[in-house]
């Protein structure tokens, strides 16, 4: 099924996780300058916060992804001040998880720091991300 709008993601019978995934996908298909993408991302954050509140061990990574995606969207719109707290929250959520989710969150946070001309913090954040060892396969 082709997604035509955010309503497709939140229609009756769609699981909450699928709804969040649909909202994220819809936001990626919108122009970065329009408001539809940001509204979808905001709704995805709200839904994933509810899911993470019910089952943190299962949905914290999804919430962090929504926060990172929204921060990245805001960075593309030159709104680094608004992106920074979202990126910081994503890092805080993924610290206990570690691995790839933490590395991606740290990279997003470093991008926010760079956009704000906080280069030493960006470098320290990237160094922390580089120090994380990948899991053995």
Tell where the protein language model's regions lie, with residue ranges.
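Residue signature of alpha-solenoid helical repeat architecture, marking inter-repeat boundaries
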Residues: 14-17, 54-57, 61, 100
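Amphipathic alpha-helical binding modules
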Residues: 98-134
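Amphipathic alpha-helical segments of tetratricopeptide repeats
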Residues: 45-53, 88-93, 130-134
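Residue at a conserved register position within TPR or TPR-like alpha-solenoid repeats
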Residues: 28-30, 55, 67, 74, ...
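Structural register within alpha-helical repeat arrays
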Residues: 19, 24-26, 44, 51, ...
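N-terminal alpha-helical interaction modules that lie
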Residues: 1-51
């Amino acid at each position: 099924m082709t997604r035509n709008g955010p309503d497709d993601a939140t229609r009756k019978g769609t699981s909450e996780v699928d709804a969040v995934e649909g909202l994220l996908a819809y936001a990626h298909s919108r122009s970065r300058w329009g408001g539809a993408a940001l509204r979808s991302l905001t709704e995805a954050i709200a839904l994933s916060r509810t899911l993470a509140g019910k089952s943190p061990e299962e949905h914290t990574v999804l919430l962090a992804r929504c926060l990172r995606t929204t921060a990245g969207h805001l960075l593309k719109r030159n709104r680094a001040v608004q992106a920074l707290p979202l990126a910081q929250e994503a890092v805080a959520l993924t610290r206990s998880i570690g691995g790839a989710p933490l590395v991606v969150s740290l990279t997003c946070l470093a991008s926010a720091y760079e956009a704000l001309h906080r280069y030493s913090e960006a470098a320290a954040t990237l160094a922390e991300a580089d120090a994380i060892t990948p899991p053995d396969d």
